[in-house]
């Protein structure tokens, strides 16, 4: 168990470089339609199925808040939220939406947020769901570090590195423009700008074509449940469920498990999130260092640093033979940097508890 003082220390690490900046009318109606058309043309996996091989890896991205002795399973966190990528590695994969990714306005937002000289678009994704609960107590987006990036490393590891505060000199500066399209009058966005043990703030609903400029890798945050409760957990949802457009109906959407349609939505039912992310460089020297690989971390360096830090606090931790895939090791690291979860939630957006 961590002391209250150390939990407070960990909480204080998790503050973005600037508070979130609210935006309105982020995309044009034409851009929104084209972004949705890409979604309509594909079949998209659950977020949880794409990123997490086991419950320990998922829990490592959360902001704590689970009781001692809690034994998680992935099924406990199964919700009908799906993800796809519009762009990655600074490359847009769909020509019809290039203007939304190579976006000069967004680049100016990113540079201004950091007071930096340079920025480049890095990644763009969407999350989409119909009516859906939210069992997430609060989480961090996956940070990247020189040599250990979200593209080449497990999400859980990047999250723990960020929460530890031990690798700040290697942290790649990022800024996001996060935009929501949701008509739900009760579904907003909760975040903790001064750290998760301080007061929360909230982007008030409805959040249709509204957004924020943020550093989500160092900002504990959570989406909020949306839609009628009785439709939030479709019967038959599984890890192989897919989200796709209904053929011949541009505003029709399907959730399928195998060949079976388990739920249907209209566009107006959706909570549709578009996440645009840029790498930001304070000056040319930082740009060069990030690009030429001259000051990169290695996995050996990362695990050595983490293990030494944990042991220096009198916590026992084994040196694993396969640190990237050892559930017991992942749990031990997560416990060592677990500040206990957000201390408070907005009265209008309480946390949905996970049933054991």
How does the language model describe each region?
Residues 2-8, 30-113, 124-126, 133-136:
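Non-heme Fe(II)-dependent double-stranded beta-helix
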Residues 15-19, 82-93, 121, 174, ...:
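Glycine-rich, often proline-containing surface loops adjacent to acidic residues and nearby aromatics
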Residues 5-16, 25:
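Cationic-aromatic interfacial patches
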Residues 21-27:
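Short amphipathic
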Residues 185-353:
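Catalytic core of Fe(II)/2-oxoglutarate
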């Amino acid at each position: 168990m961590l002391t209250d003082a150390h939990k407070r220390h960990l909480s204080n690490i998790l503050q973005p470089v600037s508070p979130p900046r609210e935006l309105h009318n982020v995309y044009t109606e034409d851009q929104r339609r084209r972004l949705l058309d890409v979604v309509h043309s594909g079949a998209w996996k659950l977020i949880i199925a794409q990123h997490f091989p086991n419950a320990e890896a998922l829990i490592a991205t959360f902001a704590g808040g689970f009781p001692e002795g809690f034994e998680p399973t992935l099924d406990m966190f199964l919700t009908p939220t799906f993800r796809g990528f519009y762009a990655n590695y600074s490359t847009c994969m769909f020509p019809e939406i290039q203007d939304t990714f190579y976006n000069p306005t967004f680049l100016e937002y990113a540079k201004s947020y950091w007071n930096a000289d340079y920025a480049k678009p890095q990644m763009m994704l969407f999350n989409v769901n119909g009516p859906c609960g939210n069992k997430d107590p609060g989480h961090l987006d996956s940070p990247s570090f020189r040599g250990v990036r979200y593209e080449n490393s497990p999400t859980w590891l990047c999250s723990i590195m960020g929460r530890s505060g031990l690798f700040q000199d290697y942290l790649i500066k990022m800024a996001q423009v996060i935009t929501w399209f949701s008509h739900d009058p009760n579904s907003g966005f909760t975040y903790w700008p001064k750290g998760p043990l301080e007061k929360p703030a909230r982007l008030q609903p409805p959040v249709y074509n509204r957004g924020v400029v943020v550093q989500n890798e160092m900002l504990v945050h959570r989406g909020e449940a949306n839609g009628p409760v009785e439709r939030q957990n479709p019967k038959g949802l599984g890890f192989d469920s897919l989200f796709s457009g209904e053929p011949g109906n541009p505003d029709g959407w399907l959730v399928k498990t195998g060949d079976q349609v388990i739920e249907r939505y209209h566009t107006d039912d959706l909570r549709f999130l578009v996440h645009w992310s840029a790498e930001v460089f304070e000056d040319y020297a930082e740009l060069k260092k990030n690009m030429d690989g001259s000051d990169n971390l290695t996995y050996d360096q990362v695990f050595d640093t983490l293990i030494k830090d944990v042991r220096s606090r009198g916590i026992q931790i084994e040196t694993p033979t396969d640190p990237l895939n050892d559930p017991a090791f992942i749990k031990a690291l997560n416990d060592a940097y677990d500040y206990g979860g957000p201390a408070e939630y907005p009265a209008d957006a309480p946390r949905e508890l996970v049933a054991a």
